[in-house]
From Swiss-Prot:
Keyword Ligase found: yes
GO molecular function annotation: ATP binding; UDP-N-acetylmuramate-L-alanine ligase activity
Protein name per the record: UDP-N-acetylmuramate--L-alanine ligase
Keywords assigned: ATP-binding, Cell cycle, Cell division, Cell shape, Cell wall biogenesis/degradation, Cytoplasm, Ligase, Nucleotide-binding, Peptidoglycan synthesis
Localization, UniProt: Cytoplasm
PANTHER family, per the entry: UDP-N-ACETYLMURAMATE--L-ALANINE LIGASE, UDP-N-ACETYLMURAMATE--L-ALANINE LIGASE-RELATED
EC number, UniProt record: 6.3.2.8
Length: 458
């Protein structure tokens, strides 16, 4: 099944789970372009309210009666097979498409698709590329995994041939895409509930590269051995980036007192320009280099690259300063993989502080178990760590792994750590601990951000 953005305008599209970040974004793009849209979700949300305002039919709860004169039903991997709307659509031969298939079909209607992949950094890099494209005024369509202030949300329905989106490797969903420019930021072990091992993940990224046409471009991190290996077999044009290696490199790097970097950008031996970032950490230099390489490939002006990156001050839940209370700075970050946690902590160490106190909420039992040893070594430099209980997401607790067990392992590695079960207990614990100049850092992909909000409101 495919969907034609230009010729299927008369079709009505129904989204099961319309309240999700990506699904609501897809629905909004369709509504902006004049399609009839309906959708269901278990709970209301600001995103759903926004879709209602744009004319979507919204149903709370899942019921076969919600499928009303629908031509295509779109669903995510999170929707179980016994969902009544999914069952009804199958029984009545209504066209079904996964979220990834549908997004791929939307991309097919554009010429310059920029698909940003990698285990870490997708949302930030997609946001950086978006800032540059908007500064250049190319009127792109944008679909990003976090809220971006410049577009007042996570989606923008542009009218040009430019389409900028994240390309997630989970369940190989990005193999449904049509990239003209494919970015690979890094390849790391994750989603081991789906993939056999890291080699399996690397092979899937190689398949993603094969989707790029010969006249298209792969933007590849030359400092990542697995990315470099995948890039060496590409049949399209390849532009590499990195700090130590690559066609596009950062030199003369310096950090200010807030941990924000400035650096010179070189193309081979040629100095192009100087960049000033307003997001912290060495990892964001690599993210910026990939955005710069993408923009140069599209012949976007140097001025728009410089100004676009300077105007980017982060997305929600990516080293987001939530507030300051009694001299204590509360910072929240979506990091849920050991590599991401280390990068976030490096950024925190470069931020002005006395002590760093951290709350980590592990995300899914399968990830916590498969990366247990890596997690136990990820919190070096934290003055004290509290683990909230594991955020289950789509999984069930088998009793094999727990936050308590992880906390004990972290203690053995020399970082003071404990496990508290309720958010209220965690907030009260830190209320008695923190002093002027300290940082409270909440980390995880679940709802751990609420702890910081509770701390600031008490």
């Amino acid at each position: 099944m495919s969907f034609d953005l230009k010729n299927d305008i008369s079709k009505k599209i129904h989204f099961i789970g319309i309240g999700g970040v990506s699904m609501s974004g897809l629905a909004e793009i369709l509504l902006e372009r004049g399609f009839k849209v309906s959708g269901s979700d278990m709970n209301g949300s600001p995103m759903i309210d926004k879709l209602k305002e744009h004319g979507a039919e919204i149903y709370l709860g899942h019921n076969e009666k919600n499928i009303n004169n629908v031509d295509i039903v779109v669903y995510t991997a999170a929707i179980p097979e016994d969902n009544p709307e999914l069952i009804y659509a199958r029984k009545n031969n209504i066209s079904l498409m996964t979220r990834a298939e549908f997004l791929g079909s939307l991309m097919k209607g554009h010429k310059y698709n920029i698909a940003i992949s990698g285990t870490h950094g997708k949302t930030t890099t997609t946001s950086m590329v978006s800032h540059i494209a908007l500064t250049e005024d190319v009127d792109p369509t944008i679909l990003v995994g976090g809220n971006l202030d410049i577009i007042n949300g996570n989606v923008l329905a542009g009218k040009s041939d430019y389409f900028i989106t994240e390309a997630c490797e989970y369940k190989a969903s990005f193999l449904e895409f049509y990239p003209y420019i494919g970015v690979i930021l890094n390849i790391d072990a994750d989603h081991l509930d789906y993939y056999k091992n890291i080699d399996d993940i690397e092979n899937t990224f190689a398949k993603f590269v094969n989707l790029i046409p010969k006249e298209g471009y792969l933007i590849a991190n030359a400092d990542d051995k697995r990315v470099a290996r995948v890039a060496s077999n590409a049949t399209c044009n390849v532009v590499s980036f990195g700090i130590d290696n690559g066609d596009i490199r950062a030199k003369n790097i310096s950090f200010n007192e807030s941990g924000f970097s400035s650096f010179d950008v070189y193309k081979s031996s040629e100095l192009l320009f100087n960049i000033e970032l307003n997001v912290p950490g060495k990892h964001n230099i690599l993210n910026a280099l990939s955005a710069i390489a993408s923009a140069l490939t599209l012949k976007i002006s140097h001025k728009s690259i410089i100004d676009g990156l300077k105007s980017f001050k982060g997305t929600h839940r990516r080293f987001e300063i939530k507030g300051v209370k009694n001299g204590i700075t509360v910072i929240d970050d979506y990091a849920h993989h050991p590599t991401e946690i280390k990068a976030t902590l490096d950024a925190a160490k470069n931020y002005p502080h006395n002590k760093i106190y951290c709350v980590f909420q592990p995300h899914t039992y399968s990830r916590t178990l498969s990366l247990f040893d890596d997690f136990s070594n990820s919190f070096s430099g934290v003055d004290e760590l509290v683990l909230a209980d594991i955020y289950a997401a789509r999984e069930k607790d088998t009793g094999v792994v727990s936050s308590l067990k992880l906390s004990e392992a972290i203690n053995k590695n020399g970082v003071k750590s404990s496990n508290l079960h309720s958010f209220e207990d965690i907030v009260n614990y830190f209320k008695s601990k923190l002093n002027d100049g300290d940082i409270l850092l909440t980390v995880g992909a679940g709802d751990v951000f609420k702890i910081g909000e509770m701390f600031l409101s008490k």
